[in-house]
Amino acid sequence: MSNDGDLNIDNLITRLLEVRGCRPGKPVTMSEAEIRALCHKSREIFLSQPILLELEAPLKICGDIHGQYNDLLRLFEYGGFPPEANYLFLGDYVDRGKQSLETICLLLAYKVKYPENFFLLRGNHECASINRIYGFYDECKRRFSIKLWKTFTDCFNCLPIAALIDEKIFCCHGGLSPDLQNMEQIRRVMRPTDVPDTGLLCDLLWSDPDKDVTGWGENDRGVSFTFGPDVVAKFLNRHDLDLICRAHQVVEDGYEFFAKRQLVTLFSAPNYCGEFDNAGGMMSVDETLMCSFQILKPSEKKAKYQYQGMNSGRPAVGGGRPGTTAGKK
């Protein structure tokens, strides 16, 4: 078993950031021992912090990244590299993209370096049965070993599953659950844990809003449920909350409101899988809980290998639009 002696966190972060400006997809040189040590150290930190995080604004919230490492670097260029800004990521760091290892290693490294300012929630892809199939297992096996993939699984099984920002914004990867009556139920989930096929933890990572549903509906994914605007309104009212912030679905503009701006979906992987023309969105929450959005535009098809640097994003919706403030009414 590795120990933390194998881990020089500053040196690792430096190497991970050195590929900025290089051709997208350039692999970062890392050793299996240091990645293993990174997993062990970050796992310790996850277990030392609550499974339901209680965070304070200001912070920036990001949705799915899915191994699109170059786009993760673009997000940080735009929002500020830690510790310049505080961050909450909503899960789905691995699978589908070409550089899941660089992506998860940079995120875990920032967690170790800035444990009180940088937060990661669990997505449905931070689960062995899913990332065994959709790319992460194959990437670990090809570049290092199956054993390393298992070490990541042990780390992912300890990630927090939801966050409350100033007791007003509820954040999770997927959505609500018919089993969720009070926040204490989330706090009672014991870690390490796999993601079960049904129940509260499954729903928080897998469910989706559906404007055409009242109450709860079947989910086309074959897992969990869909929930209607009435469920959102009821949940916010019961818990004295203002907004649900979640990820889990590709949305064209990088962010999309639902249920009269009571729920927002964030998706932070532009040109997802190279198959969509979606933008990537990041939500900034200021001290007054005003929410605004920073957008990474999808890259032009013809500029496939052109580095997309500081000017690749454009600010979206100015802060003053009605319904974008949570909390301070």
Curated annotation (Swiss-Prot):
CDD domains membership: MPP_PP1_PPKL (cd07414)
Cofactor: Mn(2+)
Biological process, per Gene Ontology: cell division; chromatin organization; meiotic cell cycle; negative regulation of protein phosphorylation; positive regulation of gene expression
InterPro entries, per the entry: Calcineurin-like_PHP_ApaH (IPR004843), Metallo-depent_PP-like (IPR029052), PP1_catalytic_subunit (IPR050341), Ser/Thr-sp_prot-phosphatase (IPR006186), STPPase_N (IPR031675)
Gene Ontology molecular function, alphabetical: metal ion binding; protein serine/threonine phosphatase activity
Enzymatic reactions: O-phospho-L-seryl-[protein] + H2O = L-seryl-[protein] + phosphate; O-phospho-L-threonyl-[protein] + H2O = L-threonyl-[protein] + phosphate
Amino acids binding Mn(2+) 1: 64, 66, 92
Positions of the catalytic residues: 125 (proton donor)
One GO CC annotation: cytoplasm
Keywords: Cell cycle, Cell division, Chromatin regulator, Hydrolase, Manganese, Meiosis, Metal-binding, Mitosis, Protein phosphatase
Signal peptide, first to last residue: none
Role this protein plays: Serine/threonine-protein phosphatase which antagonizes the function of air-2 in the regulation of chromosome cohesion. Dephosphorylates histone H3 at 'Ser-10'. Dephosphorylates translation initiation factor eIF2alpha. Involved in the activation of chloride channel clh-3 during cell swelling and meiotic maturation.
Protein name: Serine/threonine-protein phosphatase PP1-alpha
Record gene name: gsp-1
